């Protein structure tokens, strides 16, 4: 099990690297995180939700993602409330203050069931477990589902990861171990120092001191590695800055307060022809070549935030001046005329009205129902090129055209409920889709970008020889190469 001294210590990428490392050595790793809190989700082949980070780890391990690898997923909705997902299916919502009392027992059962299914499957391998946050939050430790309780249940060998970039690495390590019970300390078999900058020789005395004080070997010091995969926590998004001096196209993305599935945008970060710019509510939109409004865990509340800060008006003016806009899931819903919430899925329960005005840039009406749609899809797209696309749905709202008097609007897909686009005479467009992962389709993404390049007077670019899956595999290998170079693998895998 990979434990961390804090949130953001680097557990996810280290567990991901261990999966690929073991796979290289002929073993079959099986990633597992008992409970995760994230709005960056994936949908498996059975239409079940799981954290994107565990999907990434499964690809690193050479496995198909399955919800059993992440039996409990908490998806924050704001106001200290989260949607609770057990084994891929939504089972309710919970206030943070009530979560442990109301959901601890059923969560633990979901974790044990997920483990049992994985261990009884045809996969014969070694579990690579990832903890969450700090394992020694004394006020929560007795109700901690996914750290030391799970480690003791499985008698798992544990690695403690500390982030030296944050400072205070000695206190992080000593303090974490000091707060463990004797039977928990025995499980810690190694320590990894993460995100070290500079000459590692300068830290040799630090390694000696840590090993002397703890009696636990330091397995290695990982250098600062540029973030090559989407951060699990939206708080890290603004730290993910990209400066491409050769960029010819600027994509602006609205950083919604309750943003979800920002992994949809990941294919753009490795494109040297594109500059990405995050915009928070209250900031100036400027004049990007295209604006993307991503998914939201609370579409109506995020739309209200855009309205209050004036960003909605900026977006409308940008559209009037010929700006290109594309929304994904919640972003698509915001672009419509109305958003109706009769079952109070997103609205405040005490509100008398359930109808909310959208930006009215697309003639669609969204109604939030009680049933969540989650499924992988392969659909025929009609714009800007005709081809088959793969992606997944994950939404409560259903959208329909209010009327079809606007001759410019077309359905993006043969299945007309999945998205629409209006292409204007000046070649600008406003559109959107419910299909997450749409930009991972390489040919379609390139044609979409070429549409923007054409309007700007730039030449069309050819499709990259390296597709998105190949890029992901290459990055996983680069991550693992760095891991193997700096970590004592022989001790690690024993």
Curated annotation (Swiss-Prot):
Superkingdom field: Bacteria
GO biological process, one term: cobalamin biosynthetic process
Stored SUPFAM superfamilies: Class I glutamine amidotransferase-like, P-loop containing nucleoside triphosphate hydrolases
Signal peptide (UniProt feature, chain positions): none
Keywords: Cobalamin biosynthesis, Glutamine amidotransferase
Associated pathway: Cofactor biosynthesis; adenosylcobalamin biosynthesis
InterPro entries recorded: Class_I_gatase-like, CobQ/CobB/MinD/ParA_Nub-bd_dom, CobQ_GATase1, CobQ_synth, GATase_3, P-loop_NTPase
Gene3D superfamilies: 3.40.50.880, P-loop containing nucleotide triphosphate hydrolases
Catalytic residues, chain numbering: 329 (nucleophile), 436
Domain GATase cobBQ-type: 248-444
Keyword Nucleus: no
GO MF annotation: an example: catalytic activity
Entries under Pfam families matching the protein: CbiA, GATase_3
Job description of the protein: Catalyzes amidations at positions B, D, E, and G on adenosylcobyrinic A,C-diamide. NH(2) groups are provided by glutamine, and one molecule of ATP is hydrogenolyzed for each amidation.
Family: Belongs to the CobB/CobQ family. CobQ subfamily.
Protein name per UniProt: Cobyric acid synthase
Organism field: Prochlorococcus marinus (strain NATL1A)
